[in-house]
Amino acid sequence: MYFKRYLQLAKPGIIFGNLITLTGGFLLATHREIGFEYLPLFVYVMIGVALMIAAGCVFNNIYDQDIDSSMTRTQNRPLVTGDISVIQATIYGTILLILSCLVLYYLVNLLTLWIIIIGFIVYVGIYTVSKRLTIHATVLGGISGAIPPVAGYTAVVNILDYNALALFLILFFWQIPHSYAIAMLYIDDYKKVKLPMLPIVKGIAYTKKIMLFYLALFVVSCALPAVLGSADLFSFIVCMLVALFWMYKSIQSYRTDTDRVFAKTVFKFSIIVITAICLTMG
């Protein structure tokens, strides 16, 4: 019972999604090889990053417990129900944070540790706070969400270069339509707690146009690894095909479907697209 609640506090779904994108960065650096040579490092960086993301999610839960209690989709979270106290959650998050730093420092490299720490600070210290204050919080949160693939890449090469920037841009531009789709689907919940989400402040019609704008930027960014010479023809073809398909389905839905169906379409294909891209990167 308690193990399940502590696991829930760490948001395993978010961890899993971020580890998929981390894998994309790792595969780009190793040219789609995770053999005996790279397997230990792959395991270490996965564990280290997973622990840091889990820590970030725990502290996010602590800060958000007041609004979580008022939203339908979050009202059963452990801190809201009282299954876990704030003190217990703080200790838990701190332990996860320390373990992550130890794993990344001793078993991966210092650069990757600093990159992940930056992601943690942006997520907990900037995004979590700013989402109550500004419509731009989603964009700020996109910075932290674009960190894992960069960490996967630097775990192997131990440098920041244009390939790392390309990975960052791909994930950053992907996250905006993905996140705004979620905001549209749960707009009633966000209205309850008066969060200044873009669909609430600027309206659904404006939000849909912004989503398509970032989707177009995402399509362009998907070509960057191949342009830089780090991704092969197979990876380039897969990336461009799935990105263009997502763009096509989203535009099609924009023209013919209701707002909710449009949001579901963008969200559903965002998951398929980023998974396909990350698992064929290299």
UniProtKB/Swiss-Prot annotation:
Pathway: Porphyrin-containing compound metabolism; heme O biosynthesis; heme O from protoheme: step 1/1. It is found in: Cell inner membrane. CDD domains: PT_UbiA_Cox10. The chain crosses the membrane at residues 9-29, 39-59, 79-99, 102-122, 139-159, 165-185, 210-230, 231-251, 261-281. Pfam families: UbiA. Its EC number is 2.5.1.141. GO terms for biological process: heme O biosynthetic process. It catalyses: heme b + (2E,6E)-farnesyl diphosphate + H2O = Fe(II)-heme o + diphosphate. Its main location: membrane. The keyword Nucleotide-binding does not apply. Signal peptide: none annotated. GO terms for cellular component: plasma membrane. Gene3D superfamilies: UbiA prenyltransferase. NCBIfam families: cyoE_ctaB (TIGR01473), PRK04375.1-1 (NF003348). Belongs to the UbiA prenyltransferase family. Protoheme IX farnesyltransferase subfamily. Converts heme B (protoheme IX) to heme O by substitution of the vinyl group on carbon 2 of heme B porphyrin ring with a hydroxyethyl farnesyl side group. Carbon 2 of the heme B porphyrin ring is defined according to the Fischer nomenclature. This is Protoheme IX farnesyltransferase.
